[in-house]
Amino acid sequence: FIIVIACLFILTPTNIYAAEPDSSNGVLNEINNSIEDIYNDSIDLNVTAVSSDEDAYTLLLKHKDLVSLNSDKTLNVNYNSFVDAEKLSENDLNTLKNFIEKINVLITEKAITVDKDLLINYVTDVPREIVIRPMAQIISIMSSTRSHAKSLKKVYDNAVFGTRHLVAGSYFAQRVKPGGVWDYKVQLGTTTKYTVSDLNKSLMTGEAIGNFHYGYVGRSIFSATTLKSAAGLVQIGVGTSDIKFYKSFFDDPKDQAQIQKGIDKYNSEH
């Protein structure tokens, strides 16, 4: 129950407009502060066994000279030297490798950055992309939609320090919020109609496509109830809800129907 409430908080921006701060940034800032505490505390710690992300990070910081950044900003680690320097057991080494692998996935998915001093920061400001609205009225959406779902699931599966629900929820909210890089309503035009070739040639508006995408991608980590409740809270927040929408989580039933279609499509493929 606590997880559901936290997810609703993250998915519902404090300020609905993209130009202003939202709750997802606040959550990530809190996590970044906690990571900075781990970073600072690690100076005085002595790791005797590597059994957690915190242990692995502490060991990494102790031997910064054995870590370098690749051209894509992922971490390159000299594991042989780590074993020699710390007399690591096989289990210790596997835990360290697992931590590094998770960090590199998060870097690749643009969920975190790691600087030259190995300070981890979850990305709180996702730059907007310049999107040219398609001229064609026949489009396909499932390739990018599936790709986004896979990215979100990777962030969830690889979040470090036990933060998966908060981190993945923030990652999702930053991207689907109004004006976000996954906001198809803005990219395609709210009322512009398209024939979606890879959804049985369905005739859908940009708004309908955005709601479908939200449902499909979000379902990779969230329950249907969480997704639809969050959508309703957004409508309440901007004053576009109606008491007669109570059966659809106070969201417009047409929006909820498209969200449900996205959820159903994801469920049918997984």
Regions found by a protein language model. Name each.
Residues 10-27:
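Sec-dependent signal peptide cleavage junction
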Residues 25-66:
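N-terminal mature-domain "stem" immediately C-terminal to a signal peptide or N-terminal signal-anchor/transmembrane
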Residues 49-212:
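Glycine-rich short-loop/terminal segments
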Residues 158, 164-165, 176, 227-230, ...:
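Calcium-binding acidic motifs and repeat modules
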Residues 215-223, 265:
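Well-ordered alpha-helical scaffold segments within catalytic/enzyme domains
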